[in-house]
């Protein structure tokens, strides 16, 4: 709801992938922010490359007028693959598509290479390299969120729709112009908040 969309492509030599397991990488959603930050440095030491793609909320709003979120993520992954110095042989991808394999087809529209694409649901849970990429993306996004909090002088939580603090912040601050550039306006939850009847707002809003 608030902040950028961040994805990460991580590459690792096959004989070093087990090192990621040893340091404790797992689905980033299962780790605390402190643990993710602790693992960040270790992951950068083990991985060959980390390509991080950030799409601001403002850019996302423009793109979502023309494309679905899945399409935008496919574009970003296609760009990330094109930016790797040493193209990977196999790429495991946590698919956001309801039909997991369909996401691979989307990516191929934006990057044509010799690597094998494997799109699966819960790939960031099943493959250490996906877990590592997920952790890097989360830490990078959290850093941006912290900067936004400082600018707006408010702790609005994680910026996700599952966070009550984020929902409350938007309800109370939707009218503030300086907040608008950070809002993902095309998100369904944001649309619901925008469509509230005037009578639902407090007098001081």
Regions found by a protein language model. Name each.
Residues 1-205:
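RNase H-like, Mg2+-dependent phosphodiesterase core
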């Amino acid at each position: 709801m608030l902040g950028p969309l961040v994805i990460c492509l991580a590459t690792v030599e096959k004989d070093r992938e087990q090192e990621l397991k040893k340091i404790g990488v797992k689905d980033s959603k299962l780790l605390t922010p402190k643990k993710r930050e602790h693992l960040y440095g270790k992951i950068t030491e083990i991985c060959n490359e980390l390509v991080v793609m950030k799409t601001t909320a403002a850019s996302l709003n423009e793109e979502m007028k023309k494309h679905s979120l899945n399409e935008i993520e496919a574009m970003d992954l296609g760009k990330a693959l094109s930016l790797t110095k040493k193209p990977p042989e196999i790429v495991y991808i946590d698919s956001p598509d309801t039909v997991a394999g369909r996401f691979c087809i989307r990516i191929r529209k934006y990057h044509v290479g010799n690597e094998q694409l494997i799109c699966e649901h819960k790939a960031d849970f099943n493959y250490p390299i996906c877990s590592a990429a997920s952790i890097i993306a989360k830490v990078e996004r959290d850093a941006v969120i912290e900067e936004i909090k400082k600018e707006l002088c408010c702790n609005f939580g994680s910026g996700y729709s599952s966070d009550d603090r984020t929902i409350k912040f938007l309800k109370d601050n939707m009218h503030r112009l300086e907040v608008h550039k950070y809002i993902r306006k095309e998100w369904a939850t944001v649309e619901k908040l925008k469509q509230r009847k005037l009578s639902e707002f407090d007098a001081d809003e």
